[in-house]
């Protein structure tokens, strides 16, 4: 089920809001595909989804660097795999593939995102919480960088 739940929280309000937005965009895409919406509508959703994905991954990776997350390289690799599948979906939609194939790939991306948030992203939650605690301890504890909430 493609729904946000509190157990998906990663300890950063900003990242949680990004995740909610990504889930909403994937739901919109799935709905458009199932409803047989015009190709232009689906293309617009895909462009927005790809752009927001890039924005979110960059923000998340920046926060993980600030948090000194040890699993950052693996996390970036997971993000890159998502980007590949998203690109594959865009190619499928631009080609002559039927909507059933596109919907199948869209469903895969939806499932992947939920598993990623509940699995990979939960692994960095302690690092985010430690970063927040360092910030609360005062200046000089975080290298002077912005908070994960900004």
Regions found by a protein language model. Give the residues of each.
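Small-residue-biased structural context
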Residues: 1-150
């Amino acid at each position: 089920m493609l729904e946000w739940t509190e157990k998906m929280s990663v300890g950063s309000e900003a990242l949680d809001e990004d995740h909610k937005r990504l889930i909403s965009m994937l739901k919109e895409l799935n709905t458009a595909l199932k409803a047989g919406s015009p190709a232009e509508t689906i293309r617009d959703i895909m462009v927005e989804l790809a752009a927001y994905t890039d924005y979110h991954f960059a923000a998340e990776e920046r926060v993980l660097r600030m948090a000194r997350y040890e699993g950052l390289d693996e996390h970036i690799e997971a993000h890159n795999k998502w980007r590949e599948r998203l690109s594959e979906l865009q190619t499928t939609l631009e080609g002559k593939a039927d909507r059933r194939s596109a919907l199948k790939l869209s469903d895969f991306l939806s499932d992947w995102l939920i598993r990623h948030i509940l699995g990979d992203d939960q692994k960095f939650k302690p690092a985010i919480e430690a970063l927040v605690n360092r910030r609360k301890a005062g200046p000089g504890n975080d290298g002077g960088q912005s908070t994960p909430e900004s």
